[in-house]
Structure formats: structure tokens, C-alpha cells
Amino acid sequence: MNRKIRASDRKIIPPQCEMPKMTYSKIQNILPGLGLSVAITAAAMVLEKIEEHYAGRAWLEALVIAILLGTAVRSLARPGPRFNKGINFSAKLLLEIAVVLLGASISASAVIEAGSGLIFGIAAVVAVAITLSYGIGRLLKLPHRMAVLVACGNSICGNSAIAAMAPVIGAESEDVAASIAFTAILGVIVVLTLPLLVPLLGLSFTQYGILAGLTVYAVPQVLAATAPVSLLSVQLGTLVKLVRVLMLGPVILVFALISGNKNADVKPGFFQLVPWFIIGFLAMMALHSLHLIPEAILPAIQYASMLLTIISMAALGLGVDIRSVASAGGRVTLTAILSLIALCCISLGLIHMLGVA
């Protein structure tokens, strides 16, 4: 019965994205990493206050400081394995909860005001970006499956898109690992540098929110990229990003049809195509739109969302291994960077075409 496992047999079984259940033993396991993330968050918030006191304003927000401090701790101190579960918990689940809470500050009227033109424009941006990114990858001699993973990761929702697409196209574990490794690094770089485009390009808060929603990899990372700019940017960026994430289902269906379902022996479940926190976000937005959330508690909900986001950014920094850039390979790196630049240009073109002020 034993047989040699071929490379083509090493296919990725996508993880389920339902909200995980917590037990006492799991809580014990996450405490070291969670405590470290909270400590870095506290330090980041103190440094932000020091900035405000001596410089008159916070040039680096606590969100950004938390990422930088977390990355520095990971690079210099290298926390041991016992911190990993808590770091992963903080970087993923806490950030997803922050997204859910953010829904309480957004009304459905904002979606209606966005208009059908923007919604169809987002779908067009995703389609064009995937095509261009795949073309760039193939021109740089990336294998077909690797090019698809990078294209979908860049154009839709980063690691989630990569994990969902992998079983559909029969991707090997090495391809998935390389794609995810560099996407994690590039995602942090985008969060840190994208706000610089506001003064550089003279973008309004509305324009920047749409740009962030169209270019930042993950829904939670949109919070980190837009929070230093304005609340309006946060709200618009999140809405645009949610629409972009919902493109994952149709895109996976298209690739499954193209591949003739030969490799789709493991089909992504509902919660992989539509993560639980997006459903939670929409539910909170509906409650807010129906005036079922008391106005008096909205500031507390918004503060909790912001605080959880900072903790998650600290954990995100703790999970960044700069050496992953080298291990990802030069062609993957160049493909991802060129694809991101193309995505930014396409997004700015859409903003200009729609006449967004």
C-alpha cells in the first residue's frame, strides 16, 4: 500500500475560516504571545504620546509604531515557539474582531451612495489586475500555478486568496509557501508606505480610502493603512475592500472551470470564500443602519476596534521574518512588486475615471 509521494501529490488542503472555539488549554497557550503583543502595543501608544508632546503631532501613529516595534523584536530577540500561538491569535482573530466592530460605525447608506459604478469598477479592477499580474509572472518565467497564486493574492485578498486558490489549481506546497511568505512581507510594506501617497499625489480622504481598499491585501490591513489618515478613509477603504474580497468566489469558479475541475478535488467551503468576519461586519453595519445600536456606546465600540487593531499590528510585526524575502526568490519578488505597482495604477485610473473628488 505504501507508495512514494510525488511532488504533484502535495496539494494544499485549505484551512477552515470559521471563528475558532476557545478552550482553557488554548487560552493558556496564547497568553505568552498575546501578552507580548499587548506589551508592544502599550509601548507604541506611549511613544505616540511622546511624539505628540514634543513634536506637536504624531508623525508615526501607534499602528505603525507597533508594526515597527514588533518587527524589531522579532529580528533582534527572536521570541521562542511558545509565543507563536498567541502571536498568531493576535494577528488573525483579534484583527478580524476589530473588523466586525468597525461595521458598527458604517451605515448602509454609505454603500448606496458609493453607487453601482464603483462596484462594477472594483470588479473590473480585480479582473484586469489578475490578468496583468499573471502575464507579468509568466513573462518572468514563473510556473503557471505560481503565477496564478501571486496574481490572485495581489489582486484579491493576499494569503486568503492564495490558500483558497491552491487546491483548485492543484498547487504544490512549495509554491504556496513561497507566495505566502513574500505576500506577508509586502503586505506590511504596503500598510506602512501607502499613506505617503496622500501628500505625494494630493489625494483627498475619499480618494485615498478607495485606493487603499483596491490595493491593500487583507481586509484588516485596510484599517492599519487608512486609520492614520482619516475615519472617512477607514470606512470607504473597508467597504471597497469587502466588495473586492467578494470577488474571490467568482474568480475561483472561473479557474475551476478553466482547469476542468481536474484539480478541484478539495473545494473551498463557504467560510473560505466568505470569511466569518465579513458576515459579522455586514451584520454590525445592518444593526447600525437600523439604529439598533445605541449611539452612546458607539465611541466605545470604535475605540475597542482601534485598540484591537494596534495589538494585531504588533503581532503582525512579530510574525514578519525579513529573511522570507530572500527565500521567496527573485522572480516571485519582482512579480509581486510589479503587480502591485500595476494594481495601484489601475486603481488610480478608476478613481480618475469615476471623477471621485
From Swiss-Prot:
Topology class, membrane: Multi-pass membrane protein
Record keyword Signal present: no
Keywords: Cell membrane, Membrane, Transmembrane, Transmembrane helix
Location within or outside the cell: Cell membrane
Cellular component terms per the entry's GO annotation: plasma membrane
Predominant localisation class: membrane
Glycoprotein keyword on record: no
Matching InterPro entries: UPF0324_pro
Transmembrane segments: 29-48, 58-77, 90-112, 117-136, 149-171, 181-203, 210-232, 242-261, 268-290, 300-322, 334-356
UniProt xrefs under Pfam families: Cons_hypoth698
Protein family per UniProt: Belongs to the UPF0324 family.
Name this polypeptide is given: UPF0324 membrane protein BMEI1914
